[in-house]
Amino acid sequence: MQTIRTCLLIIGILSSVGTASFAQRVIEVDVCVYGGTSAGVIAAYTAEKLGKSAILIEQGKRLGGLTSGGLGYTDIGNKYAISGISRDFYRRVGKHYGKFEQWIFEPKVAEGIFLDYVKRGGFEVLFDSRLRQVRKQGQEITEIVLENSTDPSGETTIIKAKMFIDCG
C-alpha cells in the first residue's frame, strides 16, 4: 500500500512538472517572422502593408542583423540593380546624410531606419525571444512557443499564425 501511495505521489509530481503552469501570452497573427534581420524587418513590414497582421521575433535587443551590426558598406557594383524597399532603405540612409542615396552608413543609422519601418508598419516586435517549441499539424506549423532569451524559466509566449517566415 505504501508503495502504491509513493508511486501515485511521484506520478502526480512528475505530471505537474511536465505541465507546469507558466504564465503564457497568446498572440494570433496572419504572419509570424522569426529573426529581426534586414529581411525579417522588411518581411513583417511588407505583410502589414499588404493588409496582413504580423509580428517580428528577435532573439537579441537590436534589429537589422549585419546591416545594423557593422556591415555598413554596400558593394553591389551596379546600384541600378537595387529596387523596391531596398532602394527605399538606401534613399532613407541618403536622406539622413543629406544626399539622395547613400551606400555607406553607420550601424546606428541603419538601425534607426529599421525601427522606423516597424513604426510605419505598425507591427509588434518581441525582443529577447527565442524558440522553445514548434507545434505542427502534419507538415504545417500551426504555432510556436517562445521563451525569454535572458530568462528561459520565465513566461512563455505562444504565437499562432497562418504563415511563419524564418529570417534568422
List the predicted regions and their residue ranges.
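Boundary at the C-terminal end of the N-terminal hydrophobic targeting segment
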Residues: 20-23
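Conserved N-terminal/central alpha/beta ligand/cofactor-binding core
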Residues: 46, 52-53, 58-140
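Hydrophobic or amphipathic alpha-helical targeting/insertion segments
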Residues: 54, 61-65, 158-168
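N-terminal Rossmann-fold NAD(P) dinucleotide-binding loop
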Residues: 40
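Conserved beta-strand-loop-beta-strand element in the redox core of flavoprotein oxidoreductases
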Residues: 135-158
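Core beta-strand elements of the Rossmann-like FAD/NAD(P) dinucleotide-binding domain
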Residues: 27-29, 152-163
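Bacterial N-terminal signal peptides
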Residues: 7-17
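Beta1/beta-strand and adjacent pyrophosphate-binding region of the FAD-binding site
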Residues: 25-37
